[in-house]
Regions:
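Hydrophobic alpha-helical core bundles mediating ligand binding, dimerization, or RNAP-core interactions
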Residues: 25-28, 32
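Conserved acetyl-CoA-binding loop-helix of GNAT-fold acetyltransferases
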Residues: 93, 99-114, 121, 131-135, ...
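Terminal substrate-recognition subdomain of acyl/acetyltransferases
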Residues: 1-9, 125-126, 131-190
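Short strand-loop-strand
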Residues: 32-37, 111
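Acetyl-CoA-dependent GNAT
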Residues: 30, 38-88, 94
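A short beta-loop-alpha structural element at the N-terminal edge
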Residues: 12-23
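Hydrophobic adenine-recognition pocket in adenosine-nucleotide-binding enzymes
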Residues: 16, 93, 126
């Protein structure tokens, strides 16, 4: 898989925790109807998207967020499929922040976490008209399978290495520190 970790200055990609729930709900609530249609592969109301988002961080799997200037602008979700060594990934990027490398950076973190957990294949599904998602899947190195009314991309992962395990561990320490710092109450200096 190509290295896709280059992200714009002022952007932080980290794991999301329950303390990030309100930011995730806000991101989904701010999606326009076309963005919700692309994300859920069908018409979904703002309320339904917000209801999904309220459980996204606590659901089984992992969720990473991309913060631009301290504001959550994108998330990547890694969800087990039930099949051994396989998982599904999904992305939500705020409309004004697409095409800036956030999806690729989130995809790299998701792929590394999945491979280190023993996952061998990641699946990504999107509508044929969602060209940004197809481009992201291609950038991540996925192979495409066309079927019916959706595009199915499969990303084969190599086994973990000592370096990939070490890097994920270091990233995890920084993720926890960044999340704790963001959740810490602000104390005004007098």
């Amino acid at each position: 898989m190509p290295d896709t970790r280059e992200i714009p200055a002022g952007t932080l990609v980290r794991r999301l925790w329950s303390s990030d729930r309100d930011a995730v709900v806000g991101l989904f609530r701010d999606l326009d109807p076309d963005s919700r249609f692309d994300r859920f592969m069908g018409a979904v109301s703002e309320a339904a998207a917000a209801a999904y988002a309220s459980h996204a961080v606590s659901a089984e799997g992992l969720v990473f967020g991309a913060f631009a200037d301290g504001i959550l602008r994108g998330i990547g979700e890694l969800r087990p499929t039930g099949a051994s060594a396989e998982a599904e990934i999904a992305f939500t990027i705020a409309p004004g922040h697409r095409g800036r490398g956030l999806g690729a950076a989130l995809g790299a973190r998701l792929a590394e976490a999945a491979r280190n957990a023993g996952t061998r294949r990641l699946h990504l599904r999107c509508l044929p008209g969602n060209r940004r998602m197809r481009a992201l899947a291609q950038r991540l190195g996925a192979e495409f399978r066309l079927g019916g009314r959706e595009v199915h991309a499969v990303l084969a992962l190599s086994p973990p290495t000592l370096f990939s395990l070490w890097r994920e561990g270091i990233d995890g320490v920084f993720d926890a520190a960044a999340a704790a710092s963001a959740a810490w109450p602000t104390v005004p200096l007098v």
